[in-house]
Structure formats: C-alpha cells, structure tokens
Amino acid sequence: MSRTLHLAEQLISRPSVTPDDAGCQALLIARLAPLGFKCETIVSGPEHFRVTNLWAKFEGFSPSAQAALAQPAIESIANTELSQAKVKTLVFAGHTDVVPTGPLAQWHSHPFTPSHRAGKLYGRGTADMKTSIAAMVVAVEEFLAAHPRPALSMAFLITSDEEGPGIDGTVVVCDRLLARGEVLDYCIVGEPTSVKQLGDMIKNGRRGTLSGKLSVKGVQGHIAYPHLAKNPIHLFAPALAELVATQWDQGNDFFPATSWQVSNIHAGTGASNVIPGDLVVDFNFRFCTESTPESLQQRLLAILSKHQFEYELKWTLGGLPFLTTPGTLVDAVRGAILAETGVQTELSTTGGTSDGRFIAKICPQVIELGPVNATIHQINECVDTASLDPLKNIYKGVLERLAGLA
C-alpha cells in the first residue's frame, strides 16, 4: 500500500469533528519527531471547546553548514549548532478537524471507516483535508531521506479549529510565532483547491470577509392602523435597494469586484395582523484589495443615514484579503504541478475564507494547493485514490525547487 494512502487512512479513521483532534496530531508527531522536527503542542480555548494545535519545525542547513558537515572532524558537532545561519522556511499548514458527518444512514460506508469504491477513497475529511496532510508528511519524509541536510527549513502548522469558529486555532499559533520573532518565508495550505483534476487550480489569495448585523427600529402596531405604527421593513426597503445596486469597487487583475450579500432577514411576530417593531438583517461583504473594511463601513453607513431611520449596527471582521503575486513560491508550485501532472495550473482568489488569512499576516508568500474539492463537506466525501501520491510528489517537488535542488 502507498505510504501516503496508509497515513491518510489512519487520519480519516479518527473522528476529529471540530474541535476534537482525536489523536491525529499525535500521529503526525510520531512521524515528524524522528525526522528531526521540534514539535510543540499548543492547547487553546475554553474547557468546553479545547483546541489542539501543532507547530513542528525542522531547521535547515546553510551552505556553510553543509560544507562544514562534509568534513569528517565536524560530524560530531550537533546539527543545531551548524544550522544557525538562517535559510528560508516553508510551512505546510492544515487542519485535522472535519465538519460533522450528517445523517449516517445516507453514507454508503461509515464516514470514519476509510473505504474504497470505483477508484475513490471515501470518508469524512478525505478531500478536506486529511489526504493533503498525509501527502505533506510523506513528501517531507521522502525529501529528507534523499536530502538529509537541505538548505531549507520546514515546518507544520496544524490545528483542530478551522471548520469551527477559528479563534483558538491557527490565529493563536501565528500570534505566538510573531511574538517570539519566528520568520516564515513561504506557506502552502493544503485546502482542496483543484476543480476537475489535481493541480488545475491553486489559490494565491483570498477575499476578505466583513459581516454586519443591522437592527432597524420601528413601532409595533395593528396592521389595520399603520398610522399608529412604524414599519421597519418599509423603512429599510429603499436602503436595501440602494445597497443591492451599489458597486463597491471594480475588482482588479487578481480579484473580482467586492460583493455585498444579505444572508438573513427577520421581522414580525408570526401573526398576520401585526406590524413588526423591529427588523434584523445579517449581511456580508466579500471584499478585494481595492477596498478596506473602513471604506466599506463608511459607504454603507452613509447610505443608511441618508434614509433616516433609527438603527443599531454591529460589525465583525472575519479576515482581511491576502494576495501572493507570481514569484518564488507560485513559480515553484506551478513547476512542480506541471512536472508531475502536465497541467498548467490556474491562479485563483475565488471561494470562501481559509486560515491562509491568518498566516499571511506573518508570511509574505502563501498559496493553497490540495485535491479536487467536488465533494467537500458532503455526504460520501471522497477523492480519487490515484491522486494521493501525485499530490505528495507535487509537495515534494516544491520542496526540491525551494531548496535549489530542482
């Protein structure tokens, strides 16, 4: 059996629904520590929502350290003493947590029992994103077996809180790394980015997300006596029409234009003869680098104020947009994908948010690359079994290119 497949099956068999890691990271530590990774477990969150995070790092070797180690008299010196000269660091990032399974009766096989049918590997987390993690680990194992003293540092940043609130996971680790001056250069997040075939799309950025909860104040009353009431739905309707029609920006070469969408509207008591006293609207901006949270807030507030109704508004900034323009990391990933699959990958910033938004604050080059995403979060989630080792080879190819070995 493929070593990548074997590790993937071990991870899938662990029921790691957010925030429960279910022993996945212990399994990773058991593979990484013998390779020379210094592994650090960071537990965060309240007692009822304990999150497990892993930071594991292998210190690379500068050319001078490699030359020194080639001398017989130097062999006894600890590797850490000879790897102090800084080399670039590549981080593999991901999450061991998965979304809930949904109705078990609708699965063809148990979601936490890896199974194979018609060339596909089934189980919760196969696509999102346990096969990516398995491929990353085996790629590093093979890379270090061939190049035990690479001119590249490597790290893993793994959390069990990506599918949940995301406040005790990757962001906590990034804050700690920033506080102690850890320098990161490149990061690959193992999100399932491929669309029709492995490697046909990678994410070199993501839009920001800004949400709001708007409460419009009216006066409740009898529907037959509207002059004695103030209908908040009617008050808000013209503003809603204007907000929907507003073009917030034009987008740019890397991002589509900023989008404003309403997700929920609630008003009324449920009775058909009562004018509601208030209206609650949940909305969200998915915004590109042409806009800022402040500019979007100011423009929306100006529209609301123009329509002269009483309201309260609470904002939640879920993440800023990030972008990695073509350069060292993008070129390495493109080259590795082309060499393994023959596919010319497409750069994209579409889709939802990911933990890349936190990592981008401390790492200048972040991309996302993983398996086909057609079944993520679905009943009978699966990936092509034959894609696992090619994904591993792509990750290994990136390592070789960043280390100057390809």
UniProtKB/Swiss-Prot annotation:
Zn(2+) 1 binds at residues 95, 128, 191. GO terms for molecular function: acetylornithine deacetylase activity; cobalt ion binding; succinyl-diaminopimelate desuccinylase activity; zinc ion binding. Belongs to the peptidase M20A family. DapE subfamily. This is Succinyl-diaminopimelate desuccinylase. Pathway: Amino-acid biosynthesis; L-lysine biosynthesis via DAP pathway; LL-2,6-diaminopimelate from (S)-tetrahydrodipicolinate (succinylase route): step 3/3. Catalyzes the hydrolysis of N-succinyl-L,L-diaminopimelic acid (SDAP), forming succinate and LL-2,6-diaminopimelate (DAP), an intermediate involved in the bacterial biosynthesis of lysine and meso-diaminopimelic acid, an essential component of bacterial cell walls. It holds the Pfam family M20_dimer. The lineage of its organism: Bacteria, Pseudomonadati, Pseudomonadota, Betaproteobacteria, Burkholderiales. Binds 2 Zn(2+) or Co(2+) ions per subunit. The keyword Metal-binding applies. It catalyses: N-succinyl-(2S,6S)-2,6-diaminopimelate + H2O = (2S,6S)-2,6-diaminopimelate + succinate. The active site is at residues 97, 162. NCBIfam families: dapE_proteo, PRK13009.1. It comes from Polaromonas naphthalenivorans (strain CJ2). Zn(2+) 2 binds at residues 128, 163, 377. Its EC number is 3.5.1.18. GO terms for biological process: diaminopimelate biosynthetic process; L-arginine biosynthetic process; lysine biosynthetic process via diaminopimelate. Its cofactor is Zn(2+); Co(2+). Homodimer. Keywords: Amino-acid biosynthesis, Cobalt, Diaminopimelate biosynthesis, Hydrolase, Lysine biosynthesis, Metal-binding, Zinc.
